[in-house]
């Protein structure tokens, strides 16, 4: 996997990788990350990936990070509770 581009953003670290015929877009915020994959042949070039990182999309990413953080914190707080009988 090789890094092909960093997309500047004031809050997130956005890195684009190329691997196995796909672009892998990794968006990081603190200890969480989201990863999106797209076939290289589906886009005309890396500029299209820049355009995909629009404000509406990144606001949804931020919301998802918030939800992920809440889920993780809840799991962390409850880690000592009796395990589910299905585990």
Predicted regions and their residues:
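Mixed-charge, Lys/Arg-enriched low-complexity segments
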Residues: 42-87
């Amino acid at each position: 996997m090789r890094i092909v581009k960093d997309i500047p953003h004031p809050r997130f670290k956005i890195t684009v990788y190329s691997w196995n015929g796909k672009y892998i877009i990794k968006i990081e915020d603190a200890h969480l990350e989201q990863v999106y994959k797209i076939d290289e042949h589906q886009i005309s070039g890396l500029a299209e990936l820049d355009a995909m990182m629009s404000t509406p999309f990144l606001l949804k990413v931020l919301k998802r990070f918030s939800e992920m953080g809440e889920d993780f914190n809840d799991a962390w707080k409850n880690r000592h509770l009796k395990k589910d009988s299905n585990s």
